[in-house]
Amino acid sequence: MAAAEFLVLLKRECETCRMVGPVLAGLKARARLTLWSQDDPAFPEQTGGALDDRSLEQSWKHKVEIVPTLIRLEGGREVARTEGWNRADWARLTGIENIGKDLPPSRPGCGSITMDPGMPERLALKFGDLKLASRPIEVGEMDDPHEVAYDRGWSDGLPVIPPTDLRIARMLAGTTRKPDEVIGLIPPNLAECTIEKVAVNAVMAGCRPEYFPVVLAAIEAALKPEFSMHGLLATLWFSGPVVIVNGPVTKRIGMNWAGNALGQGNRANATIGRALQLVIRNVGGGRPQEIDRSILGNPGKYTFCFAEDEADPDWVPLNVARGHARGTSTVTLFHGDGVHGVCDQRSRDPESLSRSLALTLWSVCHPKLAQWSHAILVLSPDHYDIYKQAGWGRGEIEAGLWQALKRPGRDLVRGASGVAEGIDPSHANELVDKFHPGGLLVVRAGASGGLFSAVIGGWTAQRRNSEVQVVSQEIGT
């Protein structure tokens, strides 16, 4: 068997490292010992100093998180390690009984410099396999990087975070996927997009690394052919992608499904949706007044992302209703317009409330057009309580709304009520549904305190229900 040798990584700044100096001197006299110091090669004095690891290459290579770290090597390969000072552990690794007998039985170590904020990413860029492929842009010392981003057309109109190598590396640490993996071709230019390019735009959007898997899932969902992202970009209508997030990830990354869930103020909500839009703009070339021909647009084309309220165990979340297992984290993408408020402070039974909500839902696109678009109904807690107290869950609510949304065709045909717009006269004797089957998505969000809910109208291309569909995607790692 090969003779054991030992490796110790330490720093002068750590009191525990200073304490074990005499122990290291004794170990060096009895065994082959290599010392690496993170901050001072003259330390420890008892051993005549150490090798210089101020670059932190050795500490990074050996994945040191705590100093001192004692590593036992056999045949040049690590077989065991211990962190900090623990007499029993050091005796076990070195085979020296009563090692450090004059020291306390144990003492915790200190944080390695490799774990300082930003340092893991710096070291990965310097010494690791992470090699960024993105072309670096030199910014002059007197130039404002935010203005450079505006000048180069990278911004959606709001300032972006400069995507430095360090920030990109930190974002990439939020996923297990390789930077050079191609996630797909981004419309409208069908430009090849790698995980790294998504990371660049997620940085610019202001995302934290823990949001990154959600961003990737949103991109993958948007690229599904049935979502028709290219068509959504080119439409004259108002719509843009709306991202609804379900599952444990919403709590883990601190998303908002409560007060102001559809508004500003939550970093995860705001930046996940913005990252999707920036990828479409900066990678795919989807810019307003170019391929994006929307007549008016809507503020949600900056970002439109929120989480569903899943606090009530009796409620079936949207992703479960769409076929995913409960407890799965997913994104659902909808082609949505702005928010239309619904006020009903008098209904106290589910039938009345359903009829009331249906009146507003009929206004989506036009009150006399049917099956032209889909819609999201965002039920507030107070409106949901009316349903819940009556024993209604998702199934009953959807069925009640579906029934309330039927109208006589004669009231909707062109020319009826003196309005030229309307459905084809051939449907005059039919009972007409407002939406295609599955065209109304019901979700829960918002705060208590007002009997208000919200309707988010959909893209008019959804009248071709077999070609343009709402899509979902599980969130990976």
Regions found by a protein language model. Give the residues of each.
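A short glycine-leucine-enriched loop at secondary-structure breakpoints
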Residues: 61-65
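Thiol-based oxidoreductase modules, predominantly thioredoxin-like and allied folds used
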Residues: 30-55
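Non-transmembrane, aqueous-exposed alpha-helical and coiled segments at domain scale
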Residues: 124-477
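Catalytic cores of nucleotide-enabled group-transfer and carboxylate-activating enzymes in metabolic
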Residues: 4, 27-29, 37-39, 70, ...
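Iron-sulfur (Fe-S) cluster-binding modules
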Residues: 100-133, 140
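Structural motif
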Residues: 9-13, 36-39, 380-382, 445
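Short active-site neighborhood of thiol/selenol oxidoreductases, capturing the structured segment around
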Residues: 2-24
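Non-catalytic, surface beta->alpha helical segment in thiol-disulfide oxidoreductase systems
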Residues: 66, 71-109
